[in-house]
Every structure is written in C-alpha cells, then in structure tokens.
C-alpha cells in the first residue's frame, strides 16, 4: 500500500538524479570546445581548489558542487581517448557511486566505464582512490583500459600486482587512482601493520573505494578471513600416519539420528563440511595407533585424523585444488582461478599434502588477520558495482550500510531464458549439455558453458571431442590460464564453444563476432615475444591447434567415466584472417625497429605487455617506438575488423550468444550473473540451465523430498524431468543455502567485530610508534601506569598504613627499575596512596632521564631507536599470542550454549579481559626492557 501511495523508492531516487544529468548534458558542448591541454588544465584547477580545502564537510560540498563539470570532463576525455561516450544511465550510475551506494547494472551496460566518473571526482581531493577487482587480470585490464582516461586528464594511475616488491607497491599506492584486487589490498594492509620501519609501509590512509563485482567480494568471499601466517614446527609423521589410517576407515552411509551411531567408522556432513568419528571409529583409530586416548594433550591425534578424513572426503583434487609443481594449489571456488601462495590453515593443507604424497610443508600460526567486512569498512567512502545486488540488498545494508540502486538499461533486454532441464542422473545431464552445445554450434552461434570445477569442465571437453566439436577450455589449469586473453577474445565468434569454470566471477564481456582489439594485441605479441623477451622469461602465447578425435560419433563409456583425464585444448583459428605479404613485411620492419630501440631480448613478458597496452591507448606520447607500435596495432585491428564485422552480423542473425549453466549455484545471484553474459547491451541471446538430482545443491540441501523424488521418477537418464514440485524444491534449496551462508557470514562478522576494535587499538598504537610520535612520552606513560598498578596490587586501602606491604612493593618497583636501587621504605612510609603513586611516578621519570643520558652518550638518537624497537617487539609478540588465545577461545566458547549462555557475549567479555591483560603485559615488558637495555659499546670507543 505504501509503495502504491509513494511510488517505487528506486524510481524516486532516479528522478532526483535527473536534473544533475541534464546539467552534465548542458555542459557537454562547452567542454567539447576545449583543447586537450585545456582539459588537463581544468583538471589541475579543480584539483587545486578541492585538495586545498582541509575541512572534510566543506570538501564534500565542493565535490558535490563540481560533480557536473567533473563528469562532463570525464565524458569528453573518454570520447577522445576510448571513442566511448557515457550514456545518461551511466552518468546516473556514476552519481550513485559517488553517493557511496551500490549501483546494480546489468552485464554489458558498461560498469567499468561508469567507475571512471566517481574515481576522477574523488581523486581530485589528492587523497587517493582505490578501484577493486576480483583478480589480477581484471585489475591490469582496467588500469590499462580505463586508466587511459585518467592519464589523459593528467592524473596518475597505479596498479598493484601479485609479484610487485614493496617499493613498486608504495609508488603505485601513491598515485591518484590505484587498481588492485581485494586480496592484495587486504594483505598489504596487514603487512603494513607488521612493518618495523615507517618506510616499509606502502599504503596511504584510506579515502574512497569502488568495488567492481561487489557481491563477489563483500558477500561470496566474506566467509573467509585474510590471514598472514608464520611457520610452526609440527611432527610430519602424524600427517602421514593419519592419511594412511583414513584409507582404512569406512564412511557411514547416513548421518546419526536420535543418538544412534550409523554403521561405519565416521560420518560426513557435507552441509557443515565436517567429518565426525563414530564410537566404532574411535575404537578402530586407537587400536591402529596403539593409543588409549585420541585427545591426550601430550600425544594428540584427533585433530590429525579429522583433517585426514576431510582431505579424503571434502577436499577433491581438480575441484578444490590442483597439483602444480609438486604442490597442492588452492582453486578459488568463486572465480575458478588458482591461488598460488595461499594455504588452508589448522593443518588442513598438510593433510591434503599427505593424502597426495607430496612434501609436507610446515604448519602455520596466525600473525595477523582481518575479514573483508571489517577491512572495507575502514574506507570513509565505499561504493560498489554489480549486475546482481537486489537479492542481497538486506545484507549490504545491515553489514556495510550500503544502499542498492538499480540503474535502468540503455537498451531493452532481448535475452531469452529457456526453462531448466532436470535429469535423474549426472551422466544424463552431461550428455544433454553436449547435445545442445553441438546443436547451437552447428547453427553458427557462440556457446558459453559454465561449469563448477576443473573436473567437470574436462568431462564435458571429452564428450565434445567425441562429437568433433572444436572448443576452448578456460579453467584453473596453468596451461589454460595462460590462454585466457586469447580464449575470451574469440568466445563470441561464430560457432565458438567455450567451457569456463566459474565464468560468473570473471567479469569479462564477450563481444559478438570476436574482439578485434584483443586479437591485434595478441598478433603483435606473438611476433614480438621471440625477438624482445629474455629467454628465461619467454612465455609465447600458445598457437591454437585443431584437435582431432579418433572416435566416430556417439558417446563412449570411456568418455563418460573418465572424469579426471587431463585433456588438451582445442580451438578455432585465433586470428580471423591471414595478413598479406606486404602487411607481414611491414610488421617485420616494425620488429627490427623495436629491437634497435629496446634491445635484443631484453624485456620481461610483463614489460612487453605494458608497452603493447600503452600503444593501444590514444593518450599522447613522445616515444617514437610506441608511436610505431600504435600505428601497427591500429592497422592490424582494422584488417581484422573487416572480417569480424561480417561475422558479428552473422552471429546476431543466428541469435547471439547462448549460455549454458550446468549446475545451480548456492546463490540465485550467481546464476543470474552467468545468465547475464548473454544479451549484453540489447544483443540477442539465450540461456538454459541443465541440472541433475545428483547435483550438490539438491543432494545436500534438498532434504528427503528430493531423495523421494529420485526414487519416484522411473525415467531414463536421458529424459528431462519437468515438475512443479521439483522447481519449488530447487528454489527452496537455494533459499536455504543463501540463509545458511548469510548466517555464517553474520557470525564471522560479529565475532571479528570483537577482534576489530582490538585490532584498531593495537594498529593505531603501532602506527604512532612507527612514525616516532612522542616515543619518550609514550614509554613514560607506560611506566606511570605500571607504578599505579603496582601500588594497587600491593596496597589495600581498607587496611591502616602500618599494615601495608611496603617492602614487597619496593622490591617489585626495583624489579622494573634497577636505577631506583636506593629506594627505601623510610622514603614512602608516611605517604597516602595518592601521594605514593605520584612519588613513584616522579622517581620513574627521574630514573628514565638518567637512563636516557647514559644511552645517548653511546650514540645520539639510540634511545629513540630502542624505544621504537622494544614497543614494536612487545606489541607483535603479544598480539600474535593473543590471536592464538582468541582462536582457542572462539573454538571452546560454542560449548557454553549448552549452559544457557550466549557464546558471543561470553566471547566479547572474555576477549576484552584477555585484551586488557595483553596491553598491561605489553606496557610492563616495554618498561622492563628499556631499563635493562645495555647496548654493547665498541672496544675502541672505550679506549
């Protein structure tokens, strides 16, 4: 009723933005008359005015005042540099982002271009802007592509990549606009707060941040905290023994009910991702290991056995991890990408290494951690973009205080979403997927098939090979990751078939007919790598090969069952046409010129990529080599476009891109992301999901109803099932999972909120010390607090002064401050408690000045260095121990629910007490260390 009376709030909001859009449009003609240099001058004038205002409220008002002009400048720069003009709906998206909201824009509506508007405006404050993407590839692409606009206008653009050293990171963070992944930003923040010198700190104070694919980062990845670990020695033979034992144990066929153990040695709860030993299993393990108690603190085994069982049942090779260079490398469940350097904690990674007979790496201990929720809440200005935010609107608002606004599409959507096809068995489903893929391919339409794991993508690849359907595989396998740019460039070509693992998280648009710009870059890279790249750095882009199949039609039993076979990729010809001899000759001349300028095989692959990317820009350059490269790129692109424009028309006429989903995701939002790959910007397209009753979602969360359905449907595996009850079960299962994971994220957030307040206090103290701000006053403050604590511990105000334990008090003071060796009870016997505290504090200050004069004689400035060293040492050591204690507390506090106590409140109260104790110990240890500090002097100095 309220909605009917007041209208849709989203529509009301969009109407409010309309006058601003009209003002930007009004300024367009005026701004278009300016020369390139005048545009840059306008930027400098705006930056000088806005950055000079130190009052935050007034600065915000200035940003609002200059928004129309700033957006008009960016629009004009984009037209000149990218040949792309912001539509009115994209301007609305920019306004929404500037107001620190989430802009929901459908796939292909130009989210990446929209981000240039608020990023430019907020960069004018001079405080820096971060643009966050889900992976290195997208960060690099956006910095190269959209960075052209900002560089053209005179702003500096930085990029953070995984392999950068601290100096490179600092330089890039100091830029006006910096592109980075969420994990790189988070880990740099943690590393900065472990730095021992202010020069090691790479990040500036946070200002404004735009997150691309915001739901992927703030929702999907919010269950996993960022952790920096240090190594801890643990007995490796226990992991090996537990792995051997796990193979001897039998899995129970069902979970226990009403306290009765099922038959078997252990139960697997896939929903909770846990393995639990039965009574029979406990007995079997104790007998096998020759021990009487698996939980014996002197010789614990339970933790190792549980991890070994989880490695056996829940961590699957080529799904959760792959083996690369004799190491188990994690595969990101949301993006399908490998995450080298990341390891599971609590001994789980070691259990997987034992299972796969790999070298077992030392176990780790947490040194620093933070959740994505609390990390991104550190930004005063936070905004995000996604194609699907409304399904998680409540969580965005509750956790992050972020409103969501749906931005209208520029063109009407023409995509058709075909009804789901559900099969009784997984094999039936995969056969149907292969059949529909082959059919659409023969119609001349491109097909994108989304799979959930490396294993499944390779099964489908083998089925398509038997049908002689050429296709590309894009998954976490290293040989496929290297070809990502090539695969995406041609995924929209006529009849192209692309199998992608978790494509929904990749954030890459597929252009109908193929991407001529990418293809031109790849062509030049293919020619230049052998001539310009150092031999040890050489990674030539693989030349696509057509793979033949010995099979003659149909599906062999081998193809269906061989899920884990490592399959080579097939591909259509990458380049749309062969360049003629004159063209090849021209490219040969270019190669010779570049070798003269840049040296024979002197560059790394990344350096060559950078130069090709710079050449692809339209920004002005004085580098003749870049000019030559730019000219050649443009010529190759035009040649390819001549062919691809006809191919684009052909694909449009055939019906556009067809997207196939092979499993419902845990979240409806991710299903919608995958669907959104088709029908971008008003293109034609279609989508369909193929499901089976064996799929994880239905099997784990569907409950007994789905199990009964499986028995009820007496149909062939090749026959699709259509049932209203089944559709409802599917929707119900997805809602259950969304609620289940929301509760987990909420719990992670609530528990980390306790740690977050402590983290802020510790990191704030640490930063003051690193900057060397009032170090002496800080240490004296620690000492004064310690004197008060000693008096409170040894003097009981309820007792008369003659009964006070003055001797023990003096003894304790001397433990901390040996320079007060001549302190006697006669000096303080007649003092009141307050006078006693003041007297001891005064004596501490005198002793500290005396200590300082001794140390400074050895070398001026040494006392300040010692203060910084000891404070940082104590903070780091005690914080590390505190993190371990808090982890243990969190694990144990859950059991208090059985005693009618709220575990979270218990965690907050005990955690707070533990934190106060840690800070007290830190102060006392620093004071003790400072007075005991006796630097070694050079023998020659003494003489």
UniProtKB/Swiss-Prot annotation:
<dbReference type="InterPro" id="IPR000185">
    <property type="entry name" value="SecA"/>
</dbReference>
<dbReference type="InterPro" id="IPR011115">
    <property type="entry name" value="SecA_DEAD"/>
</dbReference>
<dbReference type="Pfam" id="PF21090">
    <property type="entry name" value="P-loop_SecA"/>
</dbReference>
<dbReference type="GO" id="GO:0031676">
    <property type="term" value="C:plasma membrane-derived thylakoid membrane"/>
</dbReference>
<dbReference type="InterPro" id="IPR036266">
    <property type="entry name" value="SecA_Wing/Scaffold_sf"/>
</dbReference>
<comment type="subunit">
    <text>Monomer and homodimer. Part of the essential Sec protein translocation apparatus which comprises SecA, SecYEG and auxiliary proteins SecDF. Other proteins may also be involved.</text>
</comment>
<dbReference type="GO" id="GO:0031522">
    <property type="term" value="C:cell envelope Sec protein transport complex"/>
</dbReference>
<dbReference type="InterPro" id="IPR014001">
    <property type="entry name" value="Helicase_ATP-bd"/>
</dbReference>
<dbReference type="GO" id="GO:0006605">
    <property type="term" value="P:protein targeting"/>
</dbReference>
<comment type="similarity">
    <text>Belongs to the SecA family.</text>
</comment>
<keyword id="KW-0813">Transport</keyword>
<dbReference type="InterPro" id="IPR044722">
    <property type="entry name" value="SecA_SF2_C"/>
</dbReference>
<keyword id="KW-0963">Cytoplasm</keyword>
<dbReference type="InterPro" id="IPR020937">
    <property type="entry name" value="SecA_CS"/>
</dbReference>
<feature type="binding site">
    <location>
        <position position="90"/>
    </location>
    <ligand>
        <name>ATP</name>
    </ligand>
</feature>
<dbReference type="GO" id="GO:0005829">
    <property type="term" value="C:cytosol"/>
</dbReference>
<keyword id="KW-1003">Cell membrane</keyword>
<keyword id="KW-0811">Translocation</keyword>
<keyword id="KW-0653">Protein transport</keyword>
<dbReference type="InterPro" id="IPR027417">
    <property type="entry name" value="P-loop_NTPase"/>
</dbReference>
<comment type="function">
    <text>Part of the Sec protein translocase complex. Interacts with the SecYEG preprotein conducting channel. Has a central role in coupling the hydrolysis of ATP to the transfer of proteins into and across the cell membrane, serving as an ATP-driven molecular motor driving the stepwise translocation of polypeptide chains across the membrane.</text>
</comment>
<feature type="binding site">
    <location>
        <position position="509"/>
    </location>
    <ligand>
        <name>ATP</name>
    </ligand>
</feature>
<dbReference type="InterPro" id="IPR011130">
    <property type="entry name" value="SecA_preprotein_X-link_dom"/>
</dbReference>
<dbReference type="GO" id="GO:0043952">
    <property type="term" value="P:protein transport by the Sec complex"/>
</dbReference>
<dbReference type="InterPro" id="IPR036670">
    <property type="entry name" value="SecA_X-link_sf"/>
</dbReference>
<keyword id="KW-0793">Thylakoid</keyword>
<feature type="binding site">
    <location>
        <begin position="108"/>
        <end position="112"/>
    </location>
    <ligand>
        <name>ATP</name>
    </ligand>
</feature>
<dbReference type="InterPro" id="IPR011116">
    <property type="entry name" value="SecA_Wing/Scaffold"/>
</dbReference>
<dbReference type="GO" id="GO:0008564">
    <property type="term" value="F:protein-exporting ATPase activity"/>
</dbReference>
<dbReference type="GO" id="GO:0005524">
    <property type="term" value="F:ATP binding"/>
</dbReference>
<keyword id="KW-0472">Membrane</keyword>
<keyword id="KW-0067">ATP-binding</keyword>
<dbReference type="GO" id="GO:0065002">
    <property type="term" value="P:intracellular protein transmembrane transport"/>
</dbReference>
<comment type="function">
    <text>Probably participates in protein translocation into and across both the cytoplasmic and thylakoid membranes in cyanobacterial cells.</text>
</comment>
<feature type="region of interest" description="Disordered">
    <location>
        <begin position="537"/>
        <end position="556"/>
    </location>
</feature>
<keyword id="KW-1278">Translocase</keyword>
<dbReference type="Pfam" id="PF01043">
    <property type="entry name" value="SecA_PP_bind"/>
</dbReference>
<keyword id="KW-0547">Nucleotide-binding</keyword>
<dbReference type="GO" id="GO:0017038">
    <property type="term" value="P:protein import"/>
</dbReference>
<dbReference type="Pfam" id="PF07517">
    <property type="entry name" value="SecA_DEAD"/>
</dbReference>
<dbReference type="Pfam" id="PF07516">
    <property type="entry name" value="SecA_SW"/>
</dbReference>
<keyword id="KW-0997">Cell inner membrane</keyword>
């Amino acid at each position: 009723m309220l909605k009917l009376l007041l209208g849709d709030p989203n529509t009301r909001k969009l109407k409010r933005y309309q006058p601003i859009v009209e003002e930007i449009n009004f300024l367009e003609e005026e701004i278009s008359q300016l020369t390139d240099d005048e545009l840059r001058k306008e930027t400098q004038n705006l930056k000088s005015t806005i950055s000079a205002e130190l009052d935050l409220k007034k600065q915000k008002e200035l940003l609002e005042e200059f928004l129309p002009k700033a957006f008009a400048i960016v629009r004009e720069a984009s037209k000149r540099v990218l040949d792309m003009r912001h539509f009115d709906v994209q301007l609305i998206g920019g306004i929404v982002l500037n107001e620190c909201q989430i802009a929901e824009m459908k796939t292909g509506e130009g989210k990446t271009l929209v981000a240039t508007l608020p990023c430019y405006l907020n960069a004018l404050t001079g405080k820096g802007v971060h643009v966050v993407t889900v992976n290195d590839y997208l960060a690099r692409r956006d910095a190269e592509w959209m960075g052209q606009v900002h560089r053209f206008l005179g702003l500096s653009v930085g990029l953070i990549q995984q392999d950068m050293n601290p100096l490179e990171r600092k330089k890039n963070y100091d830029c006006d606009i910096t592109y980075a992944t969420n994990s790189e930003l988070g880990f740099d923040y943690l590393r900065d707060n472990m730095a021992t010198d202010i020069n090691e700190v790479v990040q500036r104070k946070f200002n404004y941040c735009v997150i691309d694919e915001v739901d992927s980062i703030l929702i999907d990845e919010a269950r996993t905290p960022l952790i920096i670990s240090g190594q801890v020695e643990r007995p490796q033979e226990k992991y090996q023994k537990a792995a051997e034992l796990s193979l001897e144990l039998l899995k129970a066929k069902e979970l226990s009910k009403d306290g009765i153990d099922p038959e078997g040695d252990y139960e697997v709860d896939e929903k909770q991702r846990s393995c639990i030993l039965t009574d029979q299993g406990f007995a079997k393990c104790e007998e096998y290991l020759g021990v009487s108690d698996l939980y014996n603190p002197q010789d614990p085994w339970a933790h190792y056995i549980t991890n070994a069982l989880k490695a056996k049942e829940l961590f699957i090779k080529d799904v959760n991890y792959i083996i690369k260079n004799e190491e188990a490398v994690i595969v990101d469940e949301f993006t399908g990408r490998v995450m080298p350097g990341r390891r599971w904690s609590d001994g789980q990674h070691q259990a997987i290494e034992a299972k796969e007979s790999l070298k077992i790496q030392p176990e780790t201990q947490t040194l620093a951690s933070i959740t994505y929720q609390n990390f991104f809440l550190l930004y005063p200005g936070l905004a995000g973009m996604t194609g699907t935010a409304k399904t998680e609107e409540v969580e965005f608002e509750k956790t992050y205080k972020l409103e969501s606004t749906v931005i209208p599409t520029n063109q009407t959507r023409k995509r058709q979403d075909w009804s789901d096809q559900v099969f009784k068995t997984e094999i039936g489903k995969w056969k149907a997927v292969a059949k529909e893929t082959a059919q659409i391919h023969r119609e001349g339409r491109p097909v994108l098939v989304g799979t959930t794991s490396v294993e499944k993508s390779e099964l489908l690849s083998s089925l398509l090979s038997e049908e002689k359907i050429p296709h590309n595989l894009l998954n976490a396998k290293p040989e496929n990751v290297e070809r990502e740019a090539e695969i995406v460039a041609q995924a929209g070509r006529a009849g192209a078939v692309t199998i992608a693992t978790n494509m929904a998280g990749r954030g890459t648009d597929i252009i109908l007919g193929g991407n001529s710009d990418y293809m031109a870059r790849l062509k030049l890279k293919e020619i230049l790598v052998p001539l310009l790249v150092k031999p040890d750095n050489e990674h030539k882009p693989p030349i696509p090969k057509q793979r033949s199949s010995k099979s003659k039609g149909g599906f062999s039993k081998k193809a269906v069952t061989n899920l884990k076979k490592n399959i080579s990729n097939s591909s259509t010809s990458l380049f749309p046409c062969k360049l003629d001899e004159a063209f090849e000759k021209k490219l040969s001349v270019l190669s010779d010129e570049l070798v003269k300028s840049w040296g024979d095989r002197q560059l790394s692959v990344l350096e060559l990529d950078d130069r090709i990317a710079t050449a692809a820009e339209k920004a002005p350059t004085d580098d003749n080599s870049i000019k030559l490269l730019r000219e050649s790129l443009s010529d190759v692109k035009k040649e390819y476009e001549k062919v691809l424009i006809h191919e684009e028309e052909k694909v449009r006429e055939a019906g556009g891109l067809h997207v196939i989903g092979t499993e419902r995701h845990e979240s409806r939002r991710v299903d919608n992301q995958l669907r959104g790959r088709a029908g971008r910007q008003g293109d034609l397209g279609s989508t369909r999901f193929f499901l089976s009753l064996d799929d994880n979602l239905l099997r784990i969360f569907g409950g007994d109803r789905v199990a009964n359905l499986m028995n009820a449907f007496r149909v062939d595996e090749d026959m699709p099932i259509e049932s209203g009850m089944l559709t409802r079960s599917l929707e119900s299962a997805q809602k259950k999972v969304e609620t289940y994971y929301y509760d987990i994220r909420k719990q992670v957030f609530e528990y980390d909120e306790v740690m977050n307040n402590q983290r802020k206090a510790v990191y704030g103290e640490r930063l003051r010390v690193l900057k060397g701000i009032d170090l002496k006053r800080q240490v004296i403050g620690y000492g004064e607090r310690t004197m008060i604590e000693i008096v409170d511990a040894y003097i009981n105000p309820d007792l008369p002064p003659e009964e006070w334990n003055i001797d023990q008090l003096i003894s304790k003071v001397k433990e901390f401050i040996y320079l007060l060796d001549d302190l006697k009870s006669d000096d303080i016997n007649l003092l009141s408690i307050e006078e006693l505290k003041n007297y001891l504090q005064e004596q501490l200050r005198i002793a500290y000045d005396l200590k300082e004069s001794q140390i400074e004689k050895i070398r001026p400035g040494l006392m300040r260095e010692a203060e910084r060293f000891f404070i940082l040492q104590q903070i780091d050591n005690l914080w590390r121990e505190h993190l371990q204690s808090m982890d243990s507390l969190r694990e144990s506090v859950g059991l208090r629910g059985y005693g009618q106590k709220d575990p979270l409140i218990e965690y907050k109260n005990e955690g707070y007490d533990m934190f106060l104790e840690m800070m007290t110990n830190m102060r006392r240890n620093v004071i003790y260390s400072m007075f005991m500090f006796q630097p070694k002097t050079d023998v020659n100095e003494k003489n």
